[in-house]
Amino acid sequence: MSEAARPEKTKTERRLEKSVELNASPEQIWSALTDPKQLVQWFPLVARVTPGLGGKFFLSWGPDYEGEGEIISWEPGKRFGWKEPLGTIEFIIEARGGKTILRLVQSAFLSGEDWENEWFESTSYGWGFMLLSLHWMLERHPGADRQIRWPRQKTSLSREEAYARVFSAGAIFEIDARSLAAGTTYSLRTTTGESWSGTVEFAKPLRGICLSIRQLNDALLWFTIEGTPGKIDAQIWLSAWGVEESRLDAIHDKLAIRLRETLA
């Protein structure tokens, strides 16, 4: 059968929903979602917004990680959403008992390809970190500028092998990071000479781990393993507010070297 005659695979809707309770007003959250100056303090590296229904919403983490969508929901203080190639993303804002509930709803129409399944799982996992970053920006670092350091390394290793190498004792940490449990406190040393303590914000086997770091003014450090077999991408996101750039640069350079050596 020729490619032209091949029947198109049936696509089905996959939907993910997440919510977070925030000590912020609906107006503050609306600004965090729609003001480019606010967006870059918790979400992308670059943001551009053309306000209003039918406007454009552009997000970028660099040339390989960027996109633009059409705004499909624009109700100030209540609802904001945009359309992407695979589906839609909407945020619903609801004031409740002096706090605000922010609900994320993302739907995508997928045909079941391996890369689509991986994209959906990575997206669901990634939103956990992004919503945590929003919480950190609004409640712990209001008005502060975020600094991002983002070493990453591609590898042909399997996900299981990459995860085992990155999180085993002697790679990035001096302990086996696979033993860290979400919601617990930790105190450890890295193989780059840093002494860190804080809370394990979340952890997921074969995906990664997120730590808060007291020694970096309550920064967030997120390790994530993404990609399909043979095309694994190991990434370290360091989000810090109010920390000297030179200090973050030094940490980035050391982590990048260790990540490269670990996955070689």
Residue ranges and their predicted role:
Residues 9-17:
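N-terminal beta-strand motif that seeds the catalytic metal site of vicinal oxygen chelate
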Residues 109-164:
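Surface-exposed beta-loop interaction hotspot
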Residues 13, 62-64, 86-88, 191-195, ...:
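Glycine-centered tight beta-turn/hairpin loop motif at sheet-sheet or coil-to-beta transitions
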Residues 17, 24-28, 34-79, 146-157, ...:
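Short beta-edge strand/loop motif at the mouth of beta-sheet-based domains
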Residues 27-31, 159-164, 244-249:
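Short, conserved charged micro-motifs
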Residues 24-27, 37, 122-125, 129, ...:
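A generic structural signal for alpha-helix starts
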